[in-house]
C-alpha cells in the first residue's frame, strides 16, 4: 500500500507525538534540564491536539490494514492527549522535589500516549496488541518511578507480572480467533461472524481469553485485584494517567471491535459480560465503602465506573444511543478523574515521600484552601452522578440504554451501585469541611491556582459544571464522531 500525503495528514497526531519522543530523548542526552524537557513534552502534546483539526479536514480513511482514522478515532485520540497533557502538567511540580532522574518521566508518558493513540485508531487485532503493549510497558517504569519507596516498587512489580500474564491470555485468544476465522482485521472478523461462525467453540474460546486479557487492563471483576494497590503505590500523576488515558484508549478499541465484529450477538458472550458488569459495579462500590485512602478509594471506584460502561457496551449493536452513552460517560469520567487526581497531585507536590492520599490529610481543607476544597467537592459529586454535573449526564445515558434494551438486572445494579457510591463520595466531600486537625499534614502551595496544574484542575471543574448544566456541545461532538465510522 502506498502512503500518500493524505495518509500522513491522517497520522499527524501519531507522527507528532512520535517526533516529540525522539526530540525529548535527544534533549535528555544533550542536556538534563527539567523545565526544557517538560516544556518540549507539553508543546508536542498540544501540537498533536491542534493537528486533529487537520485530520478532520482530511476525512475518514484506512491507513494500512492496521489503522482506520475517522471521527471515532479522533474523539478518543483527543481524550487520550488531554489526559496525557494533564499528567505532564501535574508531574512538573511533583518532580521538582524528586532527587533522582526527572526527565525520563515525560519520555515514558509520551511513549504511553503513543500507544493510546494507536489503540484509538486500531482496526486490526495486531494493532490492538501493539497499542496495549506500547501503553503498558512505560507504565511499568512510571508506577515504580518513586522506586525508593517500598509501596511504589511493590506496585510496579505487581502490575508488571500480572500485566504480562494478561497479555499472554490476550495473545493466545487472538491466536485461537485467527485459527478459526483466518483473519485479524476487525471488518473481516465481522464478515466471518456474520457467516454463522460466531457459535464455533474455538472462536468463543478465543474471545473468552481476550476478555480475560482486556478485563485485566480495564480493572474489571474478577481481574481487578491489582487496581487498589497500584493506584495507591503509584505516584499521584501516574495514577492520573492510569485512571484516564489507559482506560479510555483500551475501552475505545474494545468498542470498535464490538462494532465491526458483533461479538455481543452471541448470547454466551452477552451473559458473561453482563455478569462481569454486575460484579464490577457492586463489588467496586462495596469495597470503596471502607477505604480511608483516597487513591485506593478512586481505584475501587474506577472498577465500578468501567462496570457502568460495560452495560452500554453489551447493547452496542442495538443502536447509536449506546455509542453516544459511552462517549459522554468517558468524557465525564475523564474530567472528573483529572480534577480529583489533580487535587491529590497538588497536595503531594513537591515530592516529599508518600503522597497526600490519606483522607485525614484532607480534613478541614476548606478552612485554608477553600477553592481547592470546592473543586474536590465538585469532582466527588460528579463521580457520584449528582444532577447538575457531567457525571449525572453520563450515568443517565447508561441507565437509558439499559432500559431501552430491557436489561433490568443491570439497570438495578447501576441504581444500587450509584446509591452505595453516594455514601463514600460524600464522605470525602464532608471531611473537607470538618474542623482542621491540630497538626495539619501535607498542604497545597498557597499560589496553587496560578500554577499550570492548578489551572488544569480549575478548567476540569468548570467543564464538569458547565457541561452538566448544558451538555449539548459535548453530545454534538460525540454524535459528530459517529457517522464517520
From Swiss-Prot:
GO terms for biological process, alphabetical: ATP synthesis coupled electron transport
Primary location recorded for the protein, binned into one broad class: membrane
UniProt keyword Transmembrane helix, yes or no: yes
Pfam families associated with the record: Proton_antipo_M
Listed transmembrane segments: 8-28, 35-55, 71-91, 105-125, 127-147, 159-179, 203-223, 235-255, 271-291, 297-317, 326-346, 373-393, 408-430, 455-475
Any one of the GO CC terms: plasma membrane
Reactions accelerated catalytically: a quinone + NADH + 5 H(+)(in) = a quinol + NAD(+) + 4 H(+)(out)
Keyword annotations of the record: Cell inner membrane, Cell membrane, Membrane, NAD, Quinone, Translocase, Transmembrane, Transmembrane helix, Transport, Ubiquinone
Membrane topology: Multi-pass membrane protein
GO MF annotations in UniProt: NADH dehydrogenase (ubiquinone) activity; NADH:ubiquinone reductase (non-electrogenic) activity; quinone binding
Locations listed in the record: Cell inner membrane
EC number, as in UniProt: 7.1.1.-
Xref: InterPro entries: NADH-Q_OxRdtase_suN/2 (IPR010096), ND/Mrp_TM (IPR001750)
Family per similarity comment: Belongs to the complex I subunit 2 family.
PANTHER family: NADH DEHYDROGENASE
NCBIfam families xrefs: NDH_I_N, PRK05777.1-1
Function: NDH-1 shuttles electrons from NADH, via FMN and iron-sulfur (Fe-S) centers, to quinones in the respiratory chain. The immediate electron acceptor for the enzyme in this species is believed to be ubiquinone. Couples the redox reaction to proton translocation (for every two electrons transferred, four hydrogen ions are translocated across the cytoplasmic membrane), and thus conserves the redox energy in a proton gradient.
Assembly and oligomerization: NDH-1 is composed of 13 different subunits. Subunits NuoA, H, J, K, L, M, N constitute the membrane sector of the complex.
Protein name: NADH-quinone oxidoreductase subunit N
Gene responsible for this protein: nuoN
Amino acid at each position: 500500500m502506498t502512503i500518500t500525503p493524505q495518509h500522513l495528514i491522517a497520522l499527524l497526531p501519531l507522527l507528532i507525538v512520535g517526533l516529540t519522543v525522539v526530540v525529548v530523548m535527544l534533549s535528555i542526552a544533550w542536556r538534563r534540564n527539567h523545565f526544557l524537557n517538560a516544556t518540549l513534552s507539553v508543546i508536542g502534546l498540544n501540537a498533536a491536539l491542534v493537528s486533529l483539526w487537520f485530520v478532520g479536514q482530511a476525512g475518514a480513511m484506512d491507513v494500512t490494514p492496521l489503522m482506520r482514522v475517522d471521527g471515532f478515532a479522533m474523539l478518543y485520540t483527543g481524550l487520550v492527549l488531554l489526559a496525557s497533557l494533564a499528567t505532564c502538567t501535574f508531574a512538573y511540580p511533583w518532580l521538582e522535589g524528586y532527587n533522582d532522574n526527572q526527565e525520563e518521566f515525560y519520555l515514558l508518558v509520551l511513549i504511553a500516549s503513543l500507544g493510546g493513540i494507536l489503540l484509538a485508531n486500531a482496526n486490526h487485532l495486531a494493532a490492538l496488541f501493539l497499542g496495549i503493549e506500547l501503553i503498558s510497558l512505560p507504565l511499568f517504569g512510571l508506577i515504580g518511578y518513586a522506586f525508593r519507596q517500598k509501596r511504589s516498587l511493590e506496585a510496579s512489580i505487581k502490575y508488571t507480572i500480572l500485566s504480562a500474564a494478561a497479555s499472554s491470555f490476550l495473545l493466545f485468544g487472538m491466536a485461537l480467533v485467527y485459527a478459526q476465522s483466518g483473519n485479524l482485521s476487525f471488518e473481516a472478523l465481522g464478515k466471518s461472524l456474520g457467516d454463522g461462525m460466531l457459535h464455533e467453540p474455538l472462536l468463543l474460546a478465543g474471545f473468552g481469553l481476550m476478555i480475560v486479557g482486556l478485563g485485566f487492563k480495564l480493572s474489571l471483576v474478577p481481574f481487578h485485584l491489582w487496581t487498589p494497590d497500584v493506584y495507591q503505590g503509584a505516584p499521584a500523576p501516574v495514577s492520573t494517567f492510569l485512571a484516564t488515558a489507559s482506560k479510555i484508549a483500551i475501552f475505545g478499541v474494545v468498542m470498535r471491535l464490538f462494532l465491526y465484529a458483533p461479538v455481543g450477538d452471541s448470547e454466551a458472550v452477552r451473559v458473561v459480560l453482563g455478569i462481569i458488569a454486575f460484579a464490577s459495579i457492586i463489588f467496586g462500590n462495596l469495597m470503596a465503602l471502607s477505604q480511608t485512602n483516597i487513591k485506593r478509594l478512586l481505584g475501587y471506584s474506577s472498577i465500578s465506573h468501567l462496570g457502568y460502561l460495560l452495560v452500554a457496551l453489551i447493547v452496542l449493536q442495538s443502536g447509536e444511543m449506546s455509542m453516544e452513552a459511552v462517549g459522554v460517560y468517558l468524557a465525564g469520567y475523564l474530567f472528573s478523574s483529572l480534577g480529583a487526581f489533580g487535587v491529590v497531585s497538588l497536595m503531594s507536590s513537591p515530592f516529599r515521600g508518600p503522597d497526600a492520599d490519606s483522607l485525614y490529610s484532607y480534613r478541614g481543607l476548606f478552612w485554608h484552601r477553600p477553592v481547592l476544597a470546592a473543586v474536590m467537592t465538585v469532582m466527588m459529586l460528579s463521580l457520584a452522578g449528582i444532577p447538575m454535573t457531567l457525571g449525572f449526564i453520563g450515568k443517565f445515558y447508561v441507565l437509558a440504554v439499559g432500559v431501552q434494551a430491557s436489561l433490568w438486572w443491570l439497570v438495578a445494579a447501576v441504581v444500587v451501585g450509584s446509591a452505595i457510591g453516594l455514601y463514600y463520595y460524600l464522605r470525602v466531600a464532608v471531611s473537607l469541611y470538618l474542623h482542621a486537625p491540630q497538626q495539619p499534614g501535607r498542604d497545597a502551595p498557597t499560589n496553587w491556582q496560578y500554577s499550570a496544574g492548578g489551572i488544569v484542575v480549575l478548567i476540569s471543574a468548570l467543564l464538569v459544571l458547565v457541561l452538566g448544566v448544558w451538555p449539548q456541545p459535548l453530545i454534538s461532538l460525540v454524535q459528530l464522531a459517529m457517522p464517520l465510522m
